[in-house]
């Protein structure tokens, strides 16, 4: 469904259902969404959201056998009508203050995001990813969906993360890699005993990948020691279509507590006067590349503040 929306030239707006009714209503209204696709279990929430917005919104229940028949007869089946600079994805950042910001990403952005995953993780067509992250998040959508699609490999798509089933899925489907967040790493450390883990066939796995927030070096080392699987710390944002930095794959040496080096884009560290700082000097992490967002939707002021020439300010501090 998500791929079909983008292929047809429409723009998808993924919704985080745990964001709450008020925030979801704001996103639907602000984005000007015309259609909501909903599962049966979330249909009541979808109806409440539609009641709160002024724009007309069609509701389609997607897990009904006849949901396609309910689409208006005027809907047209299209060939590929997209250009690489066209808008494909409008994803809202949660943000810690104020209203969420809508990030406009083009077809070029999301394909380049997938390419950056492929390059940094040396993905081949025989790789298989385990996706346990939600697709309303840039990590889940770009890293574990677009990465495999661009590299012509495959993925196992889970409804949600389950610490109980995680390693079982990897064993059953011979997954070669996975992308998670630090809270999932901690959950796996606490869930499995060494004996439970050793009883599974995990011979296919190449590495695990951590992103979305900093991974504590102690947790990182404990995971690798217990499970004997290399964990690659990375960094990315919604605005950068996920990956910016990544540690290299084994046998190359990783640096604990660091998100790594650029793959597929350029990174510099600037001071408050927009000058590049010397080595080992803390400054603002700025990135440039084909994966960088087009703009914040309906927010030209924030868009302008976020760029200096071709460099995007990530809002994070770092050093080289």
Question: Language-model segments: what does each one mean?
Answer:
Residues 175-180, 189-254, 273:
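Gly/Ser/Thr-rich phosphate-binding loop
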Residues 61, 74-92, 99, 122-128:
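Conserved pre-ATP/AMP-binding loop-to-beta segment of ANL
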